Regions:
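N-terminal periplasmic/intermembrane-space "pro-region" immediately following the signal or transit peptide
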Residues: 1-55, 60-70, 75
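Outer-membrane beta-barrel pore domains
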Residues: 2, 57, 64-82, 115-119, ...
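Outer membrane beta-barrel
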Residues: 3, 53-56, 78-190, 200-223, ...
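Short, structured coil/loop segments at alpha-helix boundaries
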Residues: 17-24, 38, 42, 98, ...
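Short amphipathic alpha-helical surface micro-motifs
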Residues: 31-38, 142, 300-304, 344-345
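Low-complexity, polar-biased intrinsically disordered regions enriched in Pro/Ser/Thr/Gly
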Residues: 183-197, 282-287
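Alpha-helix capping and helix-loop boundary segments enriched in small/acidic/polar residues
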Residues: 197-198, 243
Length: 401
């Protein structure tokens, strides 16, 4: 047989192979029912994965409130109760770019069940890539940034994160913090009117952290994070605009975590150095002196946890307890579901438990009792800014698919 004749046979086989591939794609479901795997289709299908979760939440909140009286004094009105009920739906999209890089996106919808107004919002909350450059892990885009186990920051950010190492990991990160957080409550009084609200500009950030295992079950972490230009801009007021406080803060943290069988004991110390470049009222006072006088610059968190519910394991459960005593200069967007009173300092505790009702259905319950640390120093002013004390009972059920 000549090479030309052999080429003709190969050409015919290739043509038939292309036809077979087209037929396999057309009848993929039927072939799958017959137990015939279509490898190429499976490989392509694995490139993109769509998952989701739906969380039903109810929170009952009870806190002491104070309000200004006509003679500009303050009085406690007693307990003011309210509740939050909502449904949060999330759709996750994970795609394989190549062997080293992946893409993750997340679309979120939240429906407010407190009224019949149809309040809801939908937004693209995550869009980032993960990959490797040499021996370095890279994450870039809009993702959930966690700093100091969430005791400093735990919410979305637009940024870049680099990490290197295995048993000892060194991490660097920088970017823009979300504006969807209460950096600090404010109160403006011009002698006639008083206006309160929240300053929400998260500013920019950069930081370094190192974490590793010191011994079996004993892990340590330490780091430094710098936040810049938080709360920039101005506040519209009846008699003009007032500059918002341009806040910078550098926060150190160091923590230990120890596994004891099914238990985990953790502790973390934090220290901040907050400063402001502008005034947030018309006085000529030095706001940095006020910061040093009234806003604590250090704090700590102690936690104890037992096991934990796993979505894939029906009947699994866990419990936890934490105590917080964090000054205003030690956090920006805290991970806790308790009331942290903006960025003004808080102390208190939280306890909770979680249980997997059925595969991919997890229930959570928690109780939080916190109070404002600023209230201890400025009982009149702090009362106008936010709750002085807060008790909340949190429940939710999350379905994943």
């Amino acid at each position: 047989m000549t090479r030309y004749e052999m080429a003709q046979i190969v050409a015919k086989a290739m043509a038939k192979g292309a036809s077979v591939e087209r037929l396999a794609a057309e009848f993929a479901d039927e072939l799958d029912n017959l137990g015939v795997r279509v490898a190429n289709l499976e490989k392509k299908a694995d490139n993109v994965k769509v998952t989701g979760e739906v969380r039903f939440r109810y929170v009952d909140q009870d806190g002491a409130m104070s309000r200004r009286t006509l003679d500009r004094g303050y009085r406690v009105l007693g307990n003011d109760s309210n509740h939050v009920a909502d449904i949060r739906s999330r759709i996750w999209i994970n795609g394989m770019i190549n062997d080293d890089w992946t893409y993750t996106g997340m679309l979120q919808n939240v429906q407010n069940l407190n009224n019949n107004a149809g309040d809801e919002n939908t937004s693209f909350q995550r869009a980032y890539v993960d990959g490797k450059l040499g021996g370095m892990a890279v994450r870039a885009g809009r993702y959930n940034l966690v700093i100091a186990d969430g005791n400093i920051y735990d919410t979305r950010a637009d940024g870049l994160e680099l990490s290197y190492g295995n048993k000892v990991k060194v991490k660097g990160f920088a970017g823009k913090a979300t504006d969807d957080i209460t950096v600090v409550p404010f109160m403006i009084n011009d002698g006639i009117n008083t206006e309160t609200g929240d300053i929400t500009n998260g500013g920019k950030y950069w930081g370094l952290a190192v974490e590793g295992e010191l011994a079996k079950g004993l892990k340590a972490t330490a780091g430094y994070t710098q936040f810049k230009d938080m709360g920039t801009g101005s506040v519209a007021f009846d008699n003009g605009n007032f500059d918002k406080t341009d806040i910078d803060n550098g926060i150190w943290h160091a923590g230990l975590s120890y596994d004891m069988g099914h238990f985990n004991l953790s502790a973390m110390y934090l220290k901040g150095d907050l400063s402001a470049d502008k005034l947030n009222d018309r006085s000529d006072g030095n706001i940095n002196k006020a910061i040093d006088k009234y806003l604590d610059d250090d704090g700590f968190v102690i936690g104890l946890a037992y096991k934990g519910a796993k979505a894939e394991d029906a009947g699994s459960w866990g419990a936890w307890a934490k105590y917080y005593d964090q000054g205003a200069q030690t956090y920006v967007a805290h991970t806790t579901d308790a009331n942290t009173f903006g960025m003004t300092g808080f102390k208190g505790f939280g306890v909770g438990a979680n249980y997997t009702l059925a595969k991919n259905i997890v229930a959570n319950v928690a109780y939080y009792n916190t109070e404002s640390k600023l209230m201890k120093e400025l009982p009149g002013i702090a009362a106008d800014l936010d709750r002085t004390k807060d008790h909340r009972f949190w429940t939710d059920v999350t379905f994943t698919f």
